[in-house]
Amino acid sequence: TWFGSETVLGIPAKFIEGGLGNVVEDPFGAGFCLILVGLFFAGKLYRMTLLTISDYYRERYGRVVEVVCSLIIMLSYLGWVSAQVTALGLVFNLLSGGAISIPIGMTIGVVSILAYTLFGGMWSVAVTDFIQMIILVVGLTLIAVFAGNMAGGADKVIELASSRELFRFLPEPSFHDIAFFIAAAITMMFGSIPQQDVFQRVMSANSIQAATRGPVIGG
């Protein structure tokens, strides 16, 4: 779910715009987030047999903190969900050759996701994520091959990217650039640890070994 339509469509544009350092938040920050969850948090949370991450806040800090954190978490999802839905609408629009407008595509995507999630629960999410990831890997690999051939070979693409310093990962040695680089990295790396989407996948594992190893492998 993390590496969905908004990631596939958004990250290439950010890479072209600002290079490798411009995508430190996602996928680098997101990947390290999963590794940290698997190494330090998944086992302890799994043993608590909670339903939501907010349940942990209630047990640890009380009802008021639970409600406040729940509201903050819901608000934090607005931008991410909006990006997912918008990108999904764009995918339908492109695949249909413009026959399906972006708003209609967004509606189709939302209704489809709500339907299989409501009726299938986390099992349906796991199955569809598995299938979608296979499609993404195969599809992006084919796109890379065809695009490279159209550009005259992969070496031409790499040469062009290198000439524009797109493979530069670290920021310029200025306070502004370094601060923004670190802020972007920790937004996903640390900010997504206490979130419901990560938590529910940990709690849905069939064993503590799967709960701890899965995020590390995924990261």
Task: Name each model-derived stretch.
Residues 10-25, 58, 101-102, 134-219:
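Loop-to-helix junctions at membrane interfaces in multi-pass transport proteins
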Residues 21-118, 183-191:
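Helix-loop-helix module between adjacent transmembrane segments
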